[in-house]
Amino acid sequence: MFRHKNILLFIFPLIYLSCINPFAPGWDDEAGQQICPNLTEIEGVLCNFRNAYSFKDTTIYGNLLSPDFTFIYRDYDRGVDVSWGREEEMRITYGLFQSAQSLSIIWNKEIASSGDSLRKTVVFGFNLTITFNPSDIARVDGYANLTFERVGFTSPWKIVRWRDESNF
């Protein structure tokens, strides 16, 4: 009996040590932080927007826009606001994604916010970098006045209006 205990006391530590791989990479505690939050959060919409631009993916981008989406910008040369709907926005974005080698958008700190749990308007600063080729890189810094809507508290937010408030 005493001999069996000694053998077990010797075998269990060996079994435990055999499960440890000193060459395995460490556990990445931050990996989950790179995944986008749910679309029930505004941050989730912005994260997916960033991913759509980074991966040049119109499917991701299209899922963020409401069917009645409107894009608006100011044409300072003519002194008028120019706008278009979701269909034209998707066509223009597809063209941008096809012509750019890489895209990067960084959403800066929230500048202003108003609304409630079903409709919210938020103004963000952004930095957009469009690389057409290594010698043709466009950088745009501006402000996006975004209006988000959702049907219910647990429903995903959709962008219904994007007013570009950049001055270029």
Tell what function each PLM region has:
Residues 70-82:
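A short gly/proline-enriched turn/hairpin at secondary-structure junctions
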Residues 19-55:
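Short, low-complexity N-terminal intrinsically disordered segments enriched in polar/charged residues
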Residues 55-72:
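Short, well-ordered alpha-helical segments enriched in acidic and aromatic residues
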Residues 37, 41-44, 48, 60, ...:
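Extracytoplasmic/secreted proteins, especially bacterial periplasmic and envelope-associated proteins
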Residues 20-30, 121, 133-168:
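Short beta-strand edge/turn micro-motifs at domain boundaries
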Residues 84-136:
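Surface-exposed, charged secondary-structure patches
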